[in-house]
């Protein structure tokens, strides 16, 4: 039996109703489930127990990634108190978890492994019918989309683009010869994705080629890994890295207003609208702190110098996200062009002699 949930908001109840054995979703769904688990663990002693359980999972991660079930007393207790409850929220009977549609953040995959869940990330496009590579129960490596399928050839172009060749690759676009010519070169399909292949043949996908940010200093930044790390914060709904042809990168954040409003009430911050809330200096300081933590793990040219909070949620309905929950970057940047220009102008003025 196959079941499809068209609305992400209804996913929790759909999982309980269907009780699937195999679960396929885009990374945004796994982010949502992670965020709900973090929210439910708030307060003492819940958070202390939760953090302890995660530390137990971290120690047993090699076994989990090898497809084994840990047998230590600590693992059994952590599983009973925490991990089993997270899995119960996903139906309780899922044996196989698959992610596709966009790169899955490494930190997120690591967290799921800590609670006993291996997410098998795969990669493919419509033009490749569709799967190119996938992690399997036997060959599995976090941070990659696995090894390529039989009879599929993959190589990395000089500019980092993933090229694919094989019998499953399409012949061309119907009645669109110019687009076909641009997409195919000597039998190789240009995926439009940036990636690499490690020494063991595992393929990693970094970002969309068109989404790479080139600063005015000539440095290239892949936004998705940074955005994925930011979205692990319970206070962030969606993050969009800015900085193309600018002097430095910045980030536009659409908050998770459920958790932000709870935090504001707990900290006695009065507000009558979301616009007033995101303009509050204490709220800005909260997000500055989140970004500062992320910056510690970034190269100097990648560090985010400014944080821009918006009062709007980024959704499929308002055109900010695709049906697979990817950012529509050009639409978002166009919609907030004035605010973005003002952000950089203020930064220029602040650093002027």
Model region roles, listed by residue range:
Residues 148-215:
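Conserved ATP-binding/catalytic segment of the ANL
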Residues 194, 199, 233-259:
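C-terminal boundary motif of the adenylate-forming
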Residues 220, 234-238, 259-309:
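Conserved C-terminal helical docking segment of ANL/AMP-forming enzymes
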Residues 3-159, 163, 167, 184, ...:
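Conserved adenylate-forming
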Residues 213, 238-240, 247, 288-353:
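Conserved C-terminal "lid"/linker of ANL adenylate-forming enzymes
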Residues 73, 142, 169-192, 227, ...:
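Conserved ANL (AMP-binding/adenylate-forming) active-site segment centered on the GW(Y/F)…HTG consensus within
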């Amino acid at each position: 039996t196959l079941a499809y949930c068209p609305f992400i908001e209804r996913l929790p109840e759909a999982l309980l109703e269907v009780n699937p054995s195999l679960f396929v979703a885009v990374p945004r769904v796994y982010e949502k489930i992670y965020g709900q688990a973090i929210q439910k663990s708030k307060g003492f002693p819940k958070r202390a127990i939760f953090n302890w359980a995660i530390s137990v999972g971290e120690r047993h991660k090699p076994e989990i990634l090898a497809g084994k079930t840990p047998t230590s007393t600590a693992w059994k207790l952590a599983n009973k108190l925490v991990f089993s409850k997270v899995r119960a929220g996903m139906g309780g009977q899922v044996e196989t978890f698959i992610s596709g549609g966009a790169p899955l953040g490494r930190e997120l995959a690591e967290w799921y492994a800590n609670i006993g869940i291996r997410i098998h990330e795969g990669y493919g496009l419509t033009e490749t019918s569709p799967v190119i590579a996938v992690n399997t129960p036997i060959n599995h490596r976090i941070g990659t989309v696995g090894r390529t399928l039989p009879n599929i050839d993959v190589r990395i172009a000089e500019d980092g683009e993933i090229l694919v060749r094989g019998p499953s690759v399409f012949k061309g676009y119907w009645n669109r010869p110019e687009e076909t010519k641009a997409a195919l070169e000597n039998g190789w399909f240009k995926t439009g994705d940036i990636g690499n292949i490690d020494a063991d043949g595992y393929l990693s996908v970094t970002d969309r080629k068109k989404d790479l940010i080139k600063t005015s200093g000539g440095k290239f930044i892949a936004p998705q890994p940074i955005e994925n790390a930011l979205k692990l914060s319970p206070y962030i709904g969606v993050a969009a890295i800015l900085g193309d042809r600018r002097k430095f990168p910045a980030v536009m954040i659409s908050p998770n207003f459920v958790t932000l409003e709870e935090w504001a009430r707990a900290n006695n911050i009065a507000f009558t609208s979301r616009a007033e809330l995101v303009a509050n200096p204490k709220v800005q300081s909260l997000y500055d702190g989140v970004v500062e933590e992320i910056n510690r793990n970034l190269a100097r040219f990648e560090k985010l110098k400014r944080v821009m909070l918006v009062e709007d949620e980024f959704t499929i309905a308002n055109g900010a996200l695709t049906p697979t929950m990817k950012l529509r970057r050009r639409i978002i940047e166009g919609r907030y062009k004035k605010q973005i220009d003002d952000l950089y102008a203020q930064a220029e003025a602040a650093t002027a002699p």
